[in-house]
């Protein structure tokens, strides 16, 4: 498998477009040291792949957040990214995890997709989580927001240190409606034959050739995907300002230093008395 790449492809004679995502390094970095249950790791892997696919599909410059939130064992799971495919993600648990489907993990809730473009107005789409799988929830989003037939297939391997998350995406092109429906049905039937182990182990060209060898997919230059947290000492200092100097000094006096941990990458930022004074000077 070629690591951490998004491949977009079209078919010369079919009104359908597709994407294939295969992620290893960025996924392992995202879940490392968080001690998530395997079901939560898998959910975050699927959500990571979905966010990469959405970022490429919706064609914007800026930032995106895809969040699942509800009343289930997983209070929320969120992936933050941008059009350069810089991604980070986190999940928060509020009770013991016993199931593995979206319904069992999130419970009654919503999927919230927020796009903050570099230029233009912020967009937010909210979709009730009415399906068992994340792929069905994403498909429902496209049916609701863009009225475009869409299908997704996800595969994850949560092996410690060797985790992988992959996804396959098909969507009709808004050209000739009847032809698009027929083309989509043809490619959907072919795509249904994909096995999880093929998505997880084979390189993109092999996967696409096996699936669509008679339809000649035209594959574009791949886009790399990377884990990028974005936390910095400077951003942490800005957050501390809101607490107030005296409260921070009192905390230092009691504990010797202030330790702020990034929720995403778990990096610790330490501040002593002089650091606190420097923040307010």
UniProtKB/Swiss-Prot annotation:
Subcellular location: Cytoplasm
InterPro entries recorded: Heat_shock_Hsp33, Heat_shock_Hsp33_C, Heat_shock_Hsp33_N, Hsp33_helix_hairpin_bin_dom_sf
Record PTM: Under oxidizing conditions two disulfide bonds are formed involving the reactive cysteines. Under reducing conditions zinc is bound to the reactive cysteines and the protein is inactive.
Pfam families linked: HSP33
Annotated keywords: Chaperone, Cytoplasm, Disulfide bond, Redox-active center, Zinc
Main location as per UniProt: cytoplasm
An annotated Gene Ontology molecular function: unfolded protein binding
Gene Ontology CC terms, in alphabetical order: cytoplasm
HAMAP family: HslO (MF_00117)
Family: Belongs to the HSP33 family.
Protein name: 33 kDa chaperonin
Upper lineage: Bacteria, Pseudomonadati, Pseudomonadota, Gammaproteobacteria, Alteromonadales
């Amino acid at each position: 498998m070629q690591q951490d790449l998004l491949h977009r492809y079209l078919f010369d004679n079919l009104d359908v477009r597709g994407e294939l995502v295969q992620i290893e390094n960025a996924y392992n970095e995202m879940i490392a040291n968080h001690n998530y249950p395997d079901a939560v790791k898998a959910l975050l892997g699927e959500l990571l792949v979905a966010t990469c696919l959405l970022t490429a599909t919706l064609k914007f410059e800026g930032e995106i957040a895809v969040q699942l939130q509800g009343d289930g064992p997983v209070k929320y799971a969120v992936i933050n990214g941008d059009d350069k495919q810089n991604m980070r993600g986190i999940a928060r648990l509020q009770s013991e995890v016993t199931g593995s489907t979206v319904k069992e993990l999130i419970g009654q809730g919503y999927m919230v997709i927020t796009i903050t473009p570099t230029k233009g107005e912020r967009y937010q789409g909210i979709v009730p989580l009415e399906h068992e799988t994340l792929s069905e929830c994403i498909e429902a989003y496209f049916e609701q927001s863009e009225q475009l037939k869409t299908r997704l297939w996800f595969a994850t391997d949560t092996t410690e240190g060797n985790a992988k998350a992959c996804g396959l995406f098909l969507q009709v092109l808004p050209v000739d409606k009847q032809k698009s429906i027929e083309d989509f049905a043809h490619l959907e039937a072919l795509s249904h034959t994909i096995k999880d182990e093929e998505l997880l182990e084979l390189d993109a060209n092999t996967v696409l050739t096996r699936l669509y060898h008679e339809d000649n997919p035209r594959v574009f230059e791949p886009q790399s995907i990377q884990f990028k947290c974005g936390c910095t000492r400077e951003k942490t200092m800005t957050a501390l300002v809101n607490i107030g100097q005296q409260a921070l000094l009192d905390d230092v006096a009691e504990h010797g230093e202030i330790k702020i941990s990034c929720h995403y990458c778990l990096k610790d930022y330490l501040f002593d008395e002089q650091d606190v004074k420097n923040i307010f000077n």
